[in-house]
């Protein structure tokens, strides 16, 4: 009985952690999503709405690790059968990790845009810039209007 309780507590704790992580995702007017990973680290990708608009993704330019960018600068390019689209960094930051899987499997952006299709991770101390982005409800309303 004690082991079951301990397992249940861990499982419950994981569920809370997942919910907390979803709460920390913000969205841009350019249809990018940003998730706070803690310790001033963030993960960036494009939204499901964006990948549907682009169509089949055929290439993702892998940015340079260590590159320092200002809010609003292009961070990479995503190419699809329809168009090439710049992806912008929504906060001042420095790239720490890139999703190398996208070099050989750019379709991950279509298949799991908010999962394995993430593009970069970066470090930023500009939490005010993160907080100024849209939450999920605001973003859902935004895409209805546009």
From Swiss-Prot:
Its main location: mitochondrion. One of its GO terms (biological process) is glycine decarboxylation via glycine cleavage system. PANTHER family: GLYCINE CLEAVAGE SYSTEM H PROTEIN (PTHR11715), GLYCINE CLEAVAGE SYSTEM H PROTEIN-RELATED (PTHR11715:SF3). It is found in: Mitochondrion. Pfam families: GCV_H. SUPFAM superfamilies: Single hybrid motif. The glycine cleavage system is composed of four proteins: P, T, L and H. Belongs to the GcvH family. Binds 1 lipoyl cofactor covalently. The glycine cleavage system catalyzes the degradation of glycine. The H protein shuttles the methylamine group of glycine from the P protein to the T protein. Residues 41-123 form the Lipoyl-binding domain. NCBIfam families: gcvH, PRK01202.1. This is Probable glycine cleavage system H protein 1, mitochondrial. The modification N6-lipoyllysine is found at residue 82. It comes from the Eukaryota. One of its GO terms (cellular component) is mitochondrion. Residues 1-30 form a transit peptide. Keywords: Lipoyl, Mitochondrion, Transit peptide. The keyword Mitochondrion applies. Its cofactor is (R)-lipoate.
């Amino acid at each position: 009985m004690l082991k079951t309780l301990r397992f249940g507590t861990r499982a419950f704790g994981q569920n809370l952690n997942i919910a907390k992580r979803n709460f920390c995702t913000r969205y841009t007017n350019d249809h990018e999503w940003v998730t706070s990973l803690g310790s001033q680290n963030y993960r960036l990708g494009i939204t499901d709405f964006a990948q549907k608009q682009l169509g089949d993704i055929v290439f993702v330019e892998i940015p340079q690790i260590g590159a320092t960018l200002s809010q609003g600068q292009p961070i990479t390019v995503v190419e699809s059968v329809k168009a090439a689209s710049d992806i912008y960094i929504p906060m001042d930051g420095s790239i720490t990790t890139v999703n190398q899987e996208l070099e050989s499997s750019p379709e991950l952006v279509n298949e799991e845009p908010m999962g394995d299709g993430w593009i970069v991770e970066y470090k930023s101390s500009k939490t005010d810039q993160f907080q100024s982005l849209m939450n999920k409800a605001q973003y859902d309303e935004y895409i209805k209007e546009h």
